[in-house]
Amino acid sequence: MIKIIKAYEECSAFAAGFQGDPHFSDPMLCSEEQIQGNLIKSIEKPDCHVIGVYFDSQMTGLFALLVLPDEKYIEMLVGLSREKEAYREMLQYLEQHWPGYSADFVFNPGNYILKELLDLRRAEFEPEQQKMVLGTPILGIDTTGIEPLSEGYMAQYCDIHNKDMYWTGERVAQAKDRFRTFLAIHDGKVVGYMDVTYIFKENEPFDLFVLKEYRRRGYGRKLLAKAVEQNEPNGMMLLVDADNTPAIRLYESMGFAKVQGQNNLTAHWKVSEQ
């Protein structure tokens, strides 16, 4: 049975019981800031649905869902359960209320239950992401050729931006209250970019891209260095493909370190239409 959660007190003890669980802890609830933003505030937001799954009056699952009808898009902000039936009920709830929507799930790579159920629904999975956190930043790195996004470069930026994601160049540019973007410029041409949040205590690069023909010229390092420099005095974390050894070494050389037990897996699913 599913009930709408109307107050944090209804689910706080249940959520706390998942901290540190190697299989079922939620990488979206690793800090107090994440608990506030992804769970507590979601209960109050009109575009979020926080639901509890119950069996014999006992909570067996807790899910926070961001739902954007205009975009036909859903993002699971919180997903906590150790029971297959709870995940099944949550997915059926999506099928009942938002058929045809695109849904993104970010969860613990050890959560074999959710992965199996999404596999059965033919979801697409991205590579496992390794979390890294900035310790002592390496300052003084040359950032020549790196500029903040401006109107004059907007068209070029949007043209090369990754379009196979919710946060397209156009959406990032409109979300000035959340993101700042840095561009790599070569002879007046945009050859790379980095989108990074700036409003949190621990900010995160969302997307880093350099055109193929301009790679191995140091632009990725310069973009990250500029983002770190402008982020002071806040912290920074990032996610990188867990098997991308060259990128991990680059980030380690700039002061980032791996965080054990906080990797994540992202799945994309087109909600089934009944």
For each of these PLM feature ranges, what is it?
Residues 67-70, 76-142, 265-267:
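Acyl-donor-binding surface of acyltransferase catalytic domains
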Residues 109-127, 221, 243-261:
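Conserved active-site alpha-helix within GNAT-family acetyltransferase domains
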